[in-house]
Design a protein with these regions (language model features):
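Residue-level signature of catalytic and energy-coupling elements of molecular machines
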Residues: 29, 57, 98, 180, ...
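A short acidic, helix-capping loop that chelates divalent metal ions and anchors anionic groups
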Residues: 10, 64-68, 188
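Conserved Rossmann-like nucleotide-cofactor binding loop
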Residues: 7, 62, 126
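Cytosolic-facing regulatory segments adjacent to core modules
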Residues: 37-39, 46-47, 51-101
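Short beta-strand "acidic-cap" motif of Rossmann-like dinucleotide-binding folds
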Residues: 1-3
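Conserved catalytic-core segment of NTP-binding enzymes
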Residues: 78-179, 188
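C-terminal lobe/tail of nucleotide-utilizing enzymes
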Residues: 139-239
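Phosphate-binding loop that captures ATP/GTP phosphates
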Residues: 7-56
Length: 239
């Protein structure tokens, strides 16, 4: 996983990574000849993951690092080379890039090199408008897009959530994977740990697990060319 939210990095906090542990960031790698392996942190043991592994590349979170990246940016060809090196050296099954919300250069660059674009959005007007714009950008880049609806108000039942998902799927002509309800426990847990690992029996954790399995299936089918999520296809909802 790469934290590419270069203007507001924060994944390192959720993973409990201290400043002292971060020697090299993705910023350093993209703006110099530093190899990507120097920025990789293996979180497998830290998070108690029994099967597989989780590797993480943090973004620079000091003010001078953020300002430098905003001012100079990074080269697309260098970014592609870094991703290729990371994927091949560690024999990755999947590479997740968490980018900045909204239309920023780093966001568009990450969309341009990815295989599948996953949008995460609340159902308020501002987020929906932004998701529509991002969907259009992905269309121009000819990238498959799926949408996850987040923080659905607790007053909205499961059937109503599904109807909302169907309407949005039809409006944007894309696949809505699921509608995640607002959960106060998740909200209170923000920036203090990985919820699904700390609350493994929680119903929402099961929903996240199903979502992850659906996403893996979508990515695999997209790579194999067996299933298309192009913008001219029939919109769908899952979950």
């Amino acid at each position: 996983m790469i934290d590419l939210d270069l203007e507001g990095p924060g994944l390192h906090v959720i993973f409990g990574i201290s400043d002292a542990e971060i020697k090299v960031t993705i910023n350093d790698v993209l703006q110099s000849a530093i190899p990507i392996r120097d920025a990789v942190l293996d979180l497998t043991s830290r998070l108690g993951i029994d099967s597989g592994c989780l590797l993480f590349c943090p973004a620079g979170h000091r003010l001078e690092e953020i300002l430098k990246m905003v001012d100079t940016g990074f080269n697309l060809s260098r970014f592609k080379a870094v991703l290729y090196s990371l994927a091949t050296e560690y024999q990755l099954d999947y590479l997740l890039i968490d980018s900045h919300p909204g239309i920023e250069k780093d966001t568009i660059v990450s969309m341009a090199v990815c295989d599948v674009v996953v949008l995460l959005s609340r159902v308020d007007h501002q987020d929906m408008f932004g998701s529509g714009v991002m969907n259009e950008v992905a269309s121009q880049l000819r990238k498959p897009v799926v949408l996850i609806l987040n923080m659905i108000p607790s007053s909205v039942g499961e059937k109503e959530s599904k109807k909302i998902g169907e309407k949005i799927a039809s409006l944007f002509n894309l696949q809505v994977l699921t509608a995640l309800p607002f959960n106060s426990d998740v909200f209170e847990n923000l920036s203090r740990g990985v919820f699904v690992l700390e609350h493994q029996k929680d119903p929402l954790t099961r929903k996240f697990t199903e979502l992850a399995e659906n996403m893996i299936g979508i990515i695999d089918r997209a790579l194999e060319g067996e299933e298309s999520y192009d913008h001219g296809s029939t919109p769908q909802t899952v979950g």
